[in-house]
Amino acid sequence: MRGTVICASKKQRKLWMVHNGRILITLDARFGRASEPTAEGVHTIYWKDKNHVSSVYGSPMPYSMFFYRGQAIHYSSDFSRRGWNGASHGCINIRNMSGLKWLWDRTPTGRKVIVFK
């Protein structure tokens, strides 16, 4: 694949930024629970909000990059604190703040996101 894309694997619990077939960064990722699954498929980052707070749950969602309805890639203090215990409400949780900031800084709106099993 040519260009830059964000790929996320539910099975491997990882997210990558890939440029022209070369992995630029790999981050641990936590996905939605069975009742609120993360949408699989090819999506596009349509909105970014560095200091987003969930209007539904009141939770801080730093470095949010929205790709499908209300689902976003964002930092999760819960994931950072509790690890793999738990799940999101459909978002892709990242526990490495500095790694996510690196990704945020290099991800414009319009960037392709591919979520797969």
Pin down the residues of each PLM region.
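Cell wall/extracellular polymer interaction/catalysis modules
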Residues: 1-42, 62-63
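Exported/periplasmic cell-wall-interacting domains
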Residues: 1-3, 36-42, 47-117
